[in-house]
């Protein structure tokens, strides 16, 4: 993986085999911990702690959360010590500001990634979307754009990449592109958006929660063509 390549995070990892194999091939691996939605990719904090032992050196561990409180974030952070925390719900700006304060005091030593949900074209108010992203980016290390669907289900669906492109061009912090990426559309997505990184999960599965390692390899081979 050269520095000229878009960075890759593979998310929704649930087992030792997948994390040991995948973490040797990508920049970051993601675990979805105790989120309040039904998904086969959700694992417990204890399981996440166990999986961390299998992460390859120099690969970042990202914990995906939809927390109800600052205390919940700190509890998971202190137990797991991930490299980054991805806030994937509708966390308020004040909530993110509070986490940023904890970073400044040294209580939290992890990058913060905040998701921005991109709605269907007919529902997009780009000015509001951009203003929201600009407010959040003051307090985080990266903005992740994902497709907004009915009640967050952490399932991969694509959105209008032109919107993500405009956001990327307007923001100062790195933009991570997620939402329905697969080996057939990822080159077009990268060419259109030019993101700092991409985030992929469900398209690389054999079944819910279990990655198909052949699909992973095929996807990463496509990325090399960028």
Swiss-Prot record:
The keyword Ribonucleoprotein belongs to this UniProt entry's keyword annotation: no
Which superkingdom does the taxonomy of this entry point to? Archaea
UniProt keyword annotations, A-Z:
Amino-acid biosynthesis, Aromatic amino acid biosynthesis, Isomerase, Tryptophan biosynthesis
UniProt GO MF annotations: phosphoribosylanthranilate isomerase activity
Stretches that traverse the bilayer? none
Name the chemical reaction catalysed here: N-(5-phospho-beta-D-ribosyl)anthranilate = 1-(2-carboxyphenylamino)-1-deoxy-D-ribulose 5-phosphate
| Gene Ontology biological process terms in this record | L-tryptophan biosynthetic process
What is its pathway? Amino-acid biosynthesis; L-tryptophan biosynthesis; L-tryptophan from chorismate: step 3/5
Q: What is its EC number?
A: 5.3.1.24
- What is the main EC category here? isomerase
Would I find Nucleotide-binding among this entry's keywords? no
Family assignment from sequence similarity: Belongs to the TrpF family.
Question: What is the protein's given name?
Answer: N-(5'-phosphoribosyl)anthranilate isomerase
